[in-house]
Amino acid sequence: MHVLQNLLFNNHLSDISEKLYFDIQKGGIQPLSENDGIILEKNSRISFGTYFNYFSLNTWRKYCQLKDLHFQLQGKGEFVLRFWLTDKNYQPSSSKRVIEKQVYLNKDQDCFCIDCSFLLKKQGILHFTIDTKGECFIQGGSFCTKTDPVNYVKLGIVITHYNRKKYLIPAIRRIETQLLSNESFKNNIGLIIVDNSQDVSSEEAGEAIVISNLNYGGSGGFTRGLLYLKDHHYTHCLFMDDDASCEIESIIKTFRLLQYSAVERLAIAGTMLYEKESTIIHEKGAQYKPLSLIQLYCGLDISKFETIIATDLDKKKIEYGAWWHFAFKIEDVNYFPFPFFVKGDDMLFGLMNHFNIITVNGICVFGEDFRYKDGPLPRYLSVRANFALALIYSDCSLWIYVWRYIRWILISILTYRYASARATSIALQHVMRGPEFWTRYLSLTDIYPVISNVLSAEKMDDVDIDQLKPIIRQVRFPILKKIIIIMTFNGFFLPDFFIRDRLILSKKEIKHFPYEIFLEKNILYYSSEYNKGYVAIYNKKKFFSELFLGLKLIIQFAARFKKLKREYRQKVPKIMTEKFWRKVYQFKR
């Protein structure tokens, strides 16, 4: 039997909500450590119709070649096992029972197997429930098949690392223990660490292959790993972040889907869930919109059964997948990454290579909230990537660029984040230097002197909220007052004596709106999840300085727009090549 999907019990990532693993509908359970399974109490009902443990018939039927499907369960005790099928017409309590079995497992017979092959003709999602009569022990379970894989897969996991050892080393240990030492995978999966910070020792690396690398960001690091895989005859590549944790089953599931895939140019994008809110989706695939993106299913609670149904059956077109978890066939790569350093490289890579990208529930990572990460440096990197990407790929009009840029500047200065506004302007200046800018400055080292004066501002530090005692302002402005706010540019066109000298609390977000800080001098941008923040201060001089600089630059950009667009489109395809990157790293195949 070939295992397609293992049962998970929330034993490895203890901070993750148990609702992603099982739904206790009656009674209770006792999770055991590591791979020891769970104990179900007497007269309990447990549903495994959860994010990690349901089986997507739609995914396996549509994208893979399976001739049969079986389910195995290991444990001890007496219980009723029921399988339920739910289709796109889901309503509460409308799941159809398709299998019901009385199961008794003892010391002599601790494995139960049932043939589910007839369900391969069905559409929908499959999950099971267990009703116990006495106390039961479930050691493990899996959906499996007798069908041999249709594709040979040698998967290289590429992790680009830079000063994140506290995340990286535990990830290496988990992959070593559960994958590289597993007879089923050790000859078909390799772990490559591209060490941009050059600080991983051989002892820390263990069985991973470490490539000491110049710091050319994620773009250069992932490309260096991809070149290694090409040179060592790997068939498939999986890009993963060094600071995102995941269930190893996400990697195994990715590997199995690639083995059984019957779809040309298939790529698998992992979902990102928040590490602090582990049931909330940050992004489950994305679509490109000129100078922005659409994060699919953002904000949905994946612990809810109706969300599982919606995200499984509602297949939106995915145009690119972020590199926190992105798997693809190496021979499908026609364009190598563009040297963005970070931000935008995954977007352009997905768009230019025209992968057939899917997301699968149960394949995910848990990452830091991007709202917390926002600041001058991320803003600089994001704006320059967005402008360059649009010049390379999009046919949108000049007015889209003008509108987006002015909006970014205004939102920053109206909310007292003048360093972010300056970072936005510097980004546009660098984009206007043309494609040669990107090949000359592969690293940020030579750029830091230009942007260093804005990096120290808006820095999140530890905050004693009780000592500062900021005011929580209730924002309820009628239409007339909103009109006044807009006409006075959030009070910047009013005399300074209108401004109140007090401290107002505002949640740290990527998008801040001026209404909540109208006529206030001091704003504490604060993240309650991390107990960090900074104070932004009303400054009319900086406001007008950044506004006029922004207007000056966008006029210059408009004058050069057609020429810039032509230069990027002519020269970028020559940069996104294997030849370019081998020259960068000065080695041949």
What are these regions (language model features)?
Residues C298-H325, Y372:
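A recurrent flexible, glycine/aromatic-enriched loop bordering the glycosyltransferase active site
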Residues R164-N182:
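Short, well-formed alpha-helical segments that are part of the catalytic scaffolds
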